[in-house]
Amino acid sequence: MYKKLNAKGAIVAEFVMYTTESKDLNSNVEFYKLPGTINSNYLKKFPIYDYKERRISISEKNKNWILLIPYKFKNKEKEIEQYYQSWKDKDTDKNNKVGELEIIWIKSNQEYFSYNVNVNPKERNYVKDSIVLVGTEDGLYPYWNRFIKS
């Protein structure tokens, strides 16, 4: 289903961890454990730039777990990488040929439009400086297809 919708330009923007309720429930959770999820079509409509100011473009054939991380969190690189690597290892079926963890350091202070009226309503439904997973037709976690159907 994702491939059909994706071919028509469908955008995935999942920032449920940034609703008021989720932020209250997760107030003691490290920021890097609360990612958003987007697809590569999102990046076509809402450009995000790496820390060298180059526009990010992700191929649908990329099999990696792609993380976009604001450069201001570079000092937490080890913790962030360990957390997502353990998540990837836990969620990856041994027979599933999932790629590597791929970290792309992005320019700090960028915003993501959430398409969700319950996400940061005072900030016009934008999320600033979130760590974001980028799902592709061939990549991200094994349940990506199920995730986007819900």
Task: Describe the predicted segments one by one.
Residues 1-150:
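Nucleotide-cofactor and metal-assisted catalytic machinery
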